[in-house]
Design a protein with these regions (language model features):
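Solvent-exposed, low-complexity, repeat-rich "mucin-like" stalks and linkers
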Residues: 24-84, 164-172
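Proteolytic processing hotspots in large secreted/extracellular or virion-associated proteins
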Residues: 144-175, 215-263, 269
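Proteolytic-maturation and junctional protease-sensitive modules
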Residues: 241-298, 303-304
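A short beta-strand micro-motif common to beta-rich folds, especially ectodomain repeats
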Residues: 115-136
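Intrinsically disordered, low-complexity repeat and linker tracts
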Residues: 149-195, 201, 293-295, 300-332
Length: 332
């Protein structure tokens, strides 16, 4: 009898172990190959405007059966794989992919470089599909906006009183609609845009949107070719073009002494320096010239032959349409 009882207890113990093992296996399967995986980006709202030429990452999460939201890891992907899908705005995105970083998965979005005047709505999704048959068992949507911020409406009101419109580097775009507003404020007269170091006076009647992003980065090919000269650079990489000829005035008070009062102005375009006729105002310590197109301007204290090539790599390249990639800043 005792032997029978012992055998019975042993069988019960084995049965209990089998049940527990089965239960643990079932839990693992539920995590890795549930018919509906609840993928998400957590609390991400995608409210941030994505700037061109930058990379952004968004961690991926999964909601477990107990309602707990945890980072997506390899443990959740035993029987499924992750893929991405772009729906709208593909032209504004260079890459849209899922990467693993520190054992967790995240969506990595790299935007196309450039200087657009309009913002592009981008729609994409991250999907979980079964490895066995490709069936979609979960997805998370990403709605993004790519572009540059527009100048504030408050800044435009300066034109009402004939004052300068200040262009912030963080908000460089002026839209077609905003130009119409500016023109109305100015009664069709010229208006002046400035950043404090430069100012540009021009009529804007019927003007389409422009990107007035600017910088003072050196053109290394020029500086290295003429090492014994002083240089000042003022660049508008978006190559904003205006319908009317305007006057660009650049403050050179900081350079007046080093340059000895001598200023020669050039436009850098496709590896070549093109001479621009400019006027020096010694009293105001400014340099002015007429132009419809804002590009990459080079100021130096010694004359350089007009048409001098400083970057040979452009010589054999075909012409590029301005709307696809402004020539003002191609080599950066």
């Amino acid at each position: 009898m005792k032997k029978f009882v012992s055998m019975f207890l042993a069988v019960c113990a084995l049965s209990s172990m089998s049940v527990n093992a089965f239960a643990q296996q079932a839990d693992a399967i539920n995590v890795t190959s549930d018919e509906k995986l609840k993928l998400s980006f957590g609390e991400e709202t995608f409210s941030e405007l994505l700037l061109p030429g930058e990379t952004y990452t968004y961690p991926l999460y999964i909601e477990q059966e107990d309602g707990k939201v945890v980072p997506l890891t390899d443990e959740h992907l035993e029987n499924v794989r992750i893929r991405t899908e772009m729906k709208n705005g593909k032209n504004a995105v260079a890459s849209f992919k899922v990467e693993e970083e520190d054992d967790v998965y995240q969506l990595e979005v790299t935007t196309e470089a450039g200087w657009p005047t309009k913002q592009t709505e981008v729609e994409g999704a991250v999907k979980a599909v079964k490895r066995s048959n490709g069936q979609v068992v979960g997805s998370a949507e990403a709605e993004l906006t790519v572009g540059y911020p527009t100048i504030s409406e408050e800044a435009l009101e300066a034109a009402k009183d004939g004052e300068y419109i200040f262009v912030e580097p963080a908000t460089p775009v002026i839209t077609t609609e905003q130009f119409a507003t500016i023109d109305e404020y100015a009664d069709g007269d010229k208006v002046t845009f400035t950043n404090g170091m430069w100012r540009y006076e021009v009529r804007v009647s019927g003007q389409e949107g422009v990107n007035m992003l600017y910088n003072e980065r050196a053109i290394k090919e020029t500086s290295s070719k003429f090492e014994d000269q002083n240089f000042k650079y003022v660049s508008f990489p978006g190559g904003p073009a205006f319908d009317f000829t305007g006057t660009m005035t650049i403050d050179v008070s900081d350079e007046m002494e080093d340059f000895g009062g001598n200023f020669y102005v050039y436009r850098y375009l496709r590896g070549k320096l093109e001479r621009i006729d400019a006027t020096i105002n010694s009293d105001e310590e400014t340099v002015s010239f007429e132009t419809k197109n804002l590009g990459r301007f080079v100021l130096t204290d010694k004359e350089i032959a007009d048409g001098t090539i400083v970057d040979e790599s452009f010589v054999s390249q075909p012409e590029t349409k301005p709307e696809s990639k402004p020539e003002a800043d191609q080599d950066e």
